[in-house]
């Protein structure tokens, strides 16, 4: 098993957060 470091967890959370924001913005633009 590979141990996941804290830095990798932070990067994963930030990337997921940014992806969610971009998806919400695209959704709002499409629903207008």
Swiss-Prot record:
What's the superkingdom here? Answer: Eukaryota
Note whether Transmembrane helix occurs among the keywords: yes
**Entry membrane topology:** Single-pass membrane protein
The answer to whether the entry has keyword Chloroplast is yes
Q: Which GO terms describe its cellular component?
A: chloroplast thylakoid membrane; photosystem I
Q: List the disulfide bonds.
A: none
One of this protein's Pfam families, by short name? PsaM
Cite the entry's keywords alphabetically.
Answer: Chloroplast, Membrane, Photosynthesis, Photosystem I, Plastid, Thylakoid, Transmembrane, Transmembrane helix
Membrane-spanning intervals of the chain: 10-27
Intracellular or extracellular location(s): Plastid, Chloroplast thylakoid membrane
A GO biological process this protein is involved in?
Answer: photosynthesis
Output the InterPro entries linked to this UniProt entry.
Answer: PSI_PsaM, PSI_PsaM_sf
Name the family the entry cites.
Belongs to the PsaM family.
* HAMAP family named in the record: PSI_PsaM (MF_00828)
Q: What is this protein called?
A: Photosystem I reaction center subunit XII
Protein source organism = Staurastrum punctulatum
């Amino acid at each position: 098993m590979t141990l996941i470091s804290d830095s990798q967890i932070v990067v994963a959370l930030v990337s997921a957060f940014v992806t969610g924001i971009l998806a919400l913005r695209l959704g709002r633009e499409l629903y207008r």
